[in-house]
């Protein structure tokens, strides 16, 4: 199965979700000074940071990571976290990345996700990576 690459802020919500998946994962560093290189296919799990206007939905660290052409060529899909209290911008980072990187938006979950979200993503990743290998 492919790699999960994720970013999580100090809230650790995304980190807790990814840890519950029990899949091989790598975390994008919070510090912009740290180089982060991905040299294999991956699915990105990203939180959404946006107020009601939709600006700033994708964390800067994720933008920096995907601005590296070598990293970007390995992305195969995106999963986004968000807060449904923000209405239309819920999970907006997934929409933005899916569109810009031309990859499927695979799943959206709230905050740190439920047990059902974890099960859905685990099962979905198994199916997704099986199809990717065909």
Curated annotation (Swiss-Prot):
Q: Which domain of life is it from?
A: Bacteria
SUPFAM superfamilies referenced in this protein's UniProt entry, alphabetically? Flavoproteins (SSF52218)
InterPro entries named among the record's database cross-references? Flavoprotein-like_sf, RNR_Ib_NrdI_bac, RNR_NrdI
Which terms does the UniProt entry file under GO BP?
A: protein modification process
Molecular-function GO term, any one? FMN binding
For this protein, the record's Pfam families field holds: Flavodoxin_NdrI (PF07972)
Relate the protein's function as given in its record: Probably involved in ribonucleotide reductase function.
Family of the protein in this entry: Belongs to the NrdI family.
Q: What is this protein called?
A: Protein NrdI
The species this protein belongs to is Rhizobium etli (strain CIAT 652)
User: Top-down, what is the taxonomic lineage of the species of origin?
Assistant: Bacteria, Pseudomonadati, Pseudomonadota, Alphaproteobacteria, Hyphomicrobiales
């Amino acid at each position: 199965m492919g790699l999960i690459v994720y970013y999580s802020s100090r809230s650790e919500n995304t980190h807790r979700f990814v840890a519950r998946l029990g899949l091989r994962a790598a975390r994008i560093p919070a510090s912009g000074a740290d180089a982060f290189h991905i040299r294999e296919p991956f699915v990105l799990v990203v939180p959404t940071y946006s107020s009601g206007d939709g600006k700033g939905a994708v964390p800067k660290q994720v933008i920096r990571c995907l601005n590296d052409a070598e990293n970007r060529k390995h992305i195969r899909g995106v999963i986004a976290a968000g807060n449904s209290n923000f209405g239309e911008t819920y999970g907006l980072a997934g929409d933005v990345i899916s569109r810009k990187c031309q990859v499927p938006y695979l799943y959206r979950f709230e905050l740190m996700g439920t047990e059902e979200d974890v099960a859905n993503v685990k099962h979905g990743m198994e199916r997704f990576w099986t199809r990717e290998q065909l």
